[in-house]
């Protein structure tokens, strides 16, 4: 996954999953179970994979069919609206539908390995949280506490931390979404 470039995964009833990704991600993706990987040179602002994605979809579905996208609430296309419009224009014989519900249902299915990874990170986070009070000192800021917490997660086996809010205050906290402050 890239924070700036789209990555596409095509899931078909009749084919193994196919990844359509920027070429910079190919080496990493080859280490996974995905066997079919199509790439484009990126960055390429005039075509961030839409032509490769279009051709791949046409090869899978031929000239008609439904294309499900995660376009429901709490979802992201991970491509510009202009690129989405271009894709729909390129594939005008196809019907684009909201597949959010089925994608969420698929995400609920976990392998034994995924379950073990989830248990591991829950254990790591719980242990760090349970011991946090031993390391907090008077006059530490939320930023310092949050940074300590992140370091402890990493040093105890977490792969990375994407986002962490932090809040404090007399009698509790009044929000759970903001970044830590100098408070």
Kindly give the residue locations of the regions a language model identified:
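Functionally constrained cores in energy, signaling, and assembly domains
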Residues: 19, 103, 115-120, 133, ...
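Short catalytic-site patches enriched in acidic/histidine residues
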Residues: 1-3, 100-102, 109, 140-183
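Contiguous, non-catalytic segments that form substrate-binding/exosite surfaces or channel walls
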Residues: 137
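A composition/biophysics-driven feature that prefers long, compositionally simple stretches
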Residues: 1-124
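Active-site pocket-lining segments that scaffold enzyme catalytic pockets across diverse folds
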Residues: 122-132, 142-144, 150
């Amino acid at each position: 996954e890239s924070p700036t470039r789209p990555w596409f995964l095509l899931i078909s009833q009749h084919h193994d999953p196919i990844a359509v990704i920027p070429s910079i991600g190919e080496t990493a993706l080859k280490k996974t179970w995905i066997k079919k990987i199509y790439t484009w040179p990126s960055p390429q602002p005039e075509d961030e994979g839409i032509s490769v994605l279009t051709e791949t979809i046409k090869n899978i579905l031929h000239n008609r069919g439904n294309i499900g996208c995660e376009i429901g609430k709490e979802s992201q296309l991970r491509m510009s609206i202009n690129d989405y419009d271009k894709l729909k224009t390129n594939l005008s014989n196809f019907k684009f539908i909201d597949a959010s519900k089925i994608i969420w249902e698929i995400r609920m299915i976990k392998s034994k390995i995924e379950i073990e990874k989830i248990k591991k990170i829950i254990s790591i986070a719980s242990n760090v949280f349970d011991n946090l009070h031993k390391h907090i000192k008077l006059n530490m800021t939320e930023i310092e506490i949050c940074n300590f917490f992140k370091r402890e997660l990493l040093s105890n086996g977490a792969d990375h931390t994407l986002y962490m809010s932090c809040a404090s205050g007399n009698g509790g906290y009044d929000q759970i979404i903001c970044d830590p402050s100098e408070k």
